Amino acid sequence: MPNSLSITDNRTGARYELPITDGTIKALDLRQIKADDRDFGVMAYDPGYLNTASTRSSVTYIDGDEGILRYRGYPIEQLAEHSTYLEVCYLLLHGDLPTKDQLETWVHDVTYHTFLHENMRRRFMDGFHHDAHPMGMMVSALAALSTFYPEAKNIEDPQNRNIQINRLISKTPTIAAMAYRASIGMPFVYPDNSLNYTENFLSMMWRVAEPHYEPHPV
């Protein structure tokens, strides 16, 4: 076999051929290597999974030595230069970049969920100590979303899953900005859905008293 690894067990003299796929062998293929019939089989020992791939992914490809990162086959540099954050989210979820009509629907569906229940701010976020770390506040708030949307537990319903995905993508910037501003003693800024996804996040983070926030163009 040209794409295989040949192993000779010096304990028994037995020889094994393990197929190599995409530069990897299956750990379970090692189980056939036994000293005798009572042997469980050879196991791979890799502390910290430093040289173990846990799964095959069609979403990302990473080659750290070569500096390669791809999402769904697209180089990350190309996506960073030519695509918006929400376009990349759509790509990761659906496998292809959205058409114009798909993007319009996708942006609408995400933007629809940017606001938080008032109790999330008044009864939950305001309950944190004044020097609580924003990351702890954010993680706690994300977990607390399940108490506001108990239907989210129905993971077998594809439509319901999509709604929860939309909620997470849309509400995470709102929660992150709210946690940050609370940590520095600044009042909460509501989402402004007239802005795009990134502009809205910057507005919620940095807006002070402007009637309408105008993000600095980069």
Predicted regions and their residues:
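Hydrophobic alpha-helical bundle cores within soluble ligand-binding/oligomerization subdomains
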Residues: 2-218
